[in-house]
UniProtKB/Swiss-Prot annotation:
Pfam families: BCL_N (PF04714). This is B-cell CLL/lymphoma 7 protein family member A. Residues 174-185 have a biased composition (Low complexity). Residues 95-105, 113-147, 158-173, 222-231 have a biased composition (Polar residues).
Length: 231
């Protein structure tokens, strides 16, 4: 009998301890941090606040096994799920009506700053997109400029080659013209010299015919005259 009484006492103590622990856990679960206004003033404090929701006696839902002493949680019923949904809706409504969303100078300034920063952040990608959209045009211009420069270089090379060819051909033509002029001048000189020689011979023959003496005799006579003069 003594052993059974001891076991019963330990079971009751364990049950009490478990109840205390669960109560402490439930208290922690039903508390949350929120911004709360102090009275009628605009002062707000961020502190722990109990969750405003309908109380459900979890102790009634818990079933203890007398043999094992363990706690068993039954499956949630439809009513409990409906209550949970209601509590979630209430939480959402309370968050909407909490002092966080209430209008005040400090919070309005903070919200304005946040909205300005978000607008700047939203505008910056648009600017980047615009710059990226505008940037291909210079790339196209740059790509067309080298093509135009290459065409110009090719045209310049072709013009230079044509000029060189024309200069070479003009040089050859001038050289051939100078050679032809030199040849013609040489021919003219030879012709004039031949004409002069022929005229000189003709004049000598005419003089000889006028004197009536052959040229050899005349040469002898000319040579004898200086001798006579010397005598």
């Amino acid at each position: 009998m003594s052993g059974r009484s001891v076991r019963a006492e330990t079971r009751s103590r364990a049950k009490d301890d478990i109840k205390r622990v669960m109560a402490a856990i439930e208290k922690v679960r039903k508390w949350e941090k929120k911004w709360v206004t102090v009275g009628d003033t605009s002062l707000r404090i961020y502190k722990w606040v109990p969750v405003a929701e309908p109380k459900v006696d979890d102790i009634d839902l818990k079933v203890t096994d007398e043999n094992s002493g363990l706690l068993r949680r039954p499956k949630p019923s439809a009513k409990k799920t409906k209550n949970k949904k209601k509590t979630k809706d209430d939480k959402c409504g309370s968050e909407l009506t909490t002092p966080e969303n209430s209008s005040s100078p400090g919070m309005m300034d903070m919200q304005d700053d946040c909205s300005n920063q978000s607008s700047i952040a939203d505008a910056s990608p648009v600017k980047q997109e615009n710059s990226s959209n505008c940037s291909p045009a210079p790339d196209q211009n740059v790509s067309t400029q080298p093509e135009g420069s290459e065409v110009k270089l090719e045209e310049g090379h072709s013009n230079a080659s044509e000029q060189q060819d024309s200069e070479v051909s003009s040089g050859q033509n001038s050289h051939s013209s100078t050679e032809s002029s030199l040849n013609s001048s040489e021919k003219a000189d030879t012709q004039t010299s031949g004409d002069k020689d022929s005229t000189m011979e003709a004049s000598k023959n005419s003089q000889d015919s006028d004197d009536g003496t052959p040229p050899c005799k005349k040469a002898k006579g000319d040579s004898s005259q200086p001798n006579n003069d010397g005598i």
